[in-house]
A protein has these predicted regions:
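Terminal alpha-helical segments
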Residues: 1-145
Length: 145
């Protein structure tokens, strides 16, 4: 079954809200799997929370990429380097992708409780910052109308 293109499902803000909801759901699942001691799964869901949060930010511009690499690269270039989002967060996003990849594909990777907790913390922080950024942007546009 063909998935609808993000531009076919409503306004840009509809797509932003949907992607933020998916990011929140992923973060909730990361917390649940973490509490159950399923650290590999929690790393996966924390990363996807980060990824869907970034996709929400890019959706505000009407931008979407097919590959994660392109999405993360664009976000770092256009949001982290100009310090719309903190540079330290950019480094944590790169680390999150590496850990998710190891958790998913390296059968000998042992996901630690500490690193997984850091991943979840990073996901929560970027979601918080993105929601604040997107809300501020939306309010500014409404005031201009």
């Amino acid at each position: 079954m063909k998935q609808p293109d993000s531009l076919d499902v409503g306004t840009k803000m509809d797509v932003v809200r949907h992607r933020l909801n998916v990011a929140r759901e992923d973060l909730d699942t990361a917390h649940l799997t973490f509490k159950a001691g399923k650290y590999r799964a929690a790393n996966n869901r924390a990363y996807y929370s980060i990824f869907h949060t970034i996709c929400a930010v890019l959706a505000k511009e009407g931008i979407a990429f097919k590959r994660h690499k392109d999405t993360l690269s664009y976000f770092n270039k256009n949001y982290v380097q100009p310090e719309i989002f903190p540079r330290e967060l950019g480094r944590k996003i790169v680390k999150a992708e590496e850990i998710r990849h190891a958790s998913d594909y390296d059968t000998f990777y042992i996901a630690s409780k500490e690193i997984t907790a850091q991943q979840i913390e990073t996901a929560a922080k970027i979601l918080e910052l993105a929601e604040k950024y997107l809300l501020t942007e939306s309010e500014q546009q409404e005031n201009e109308i």
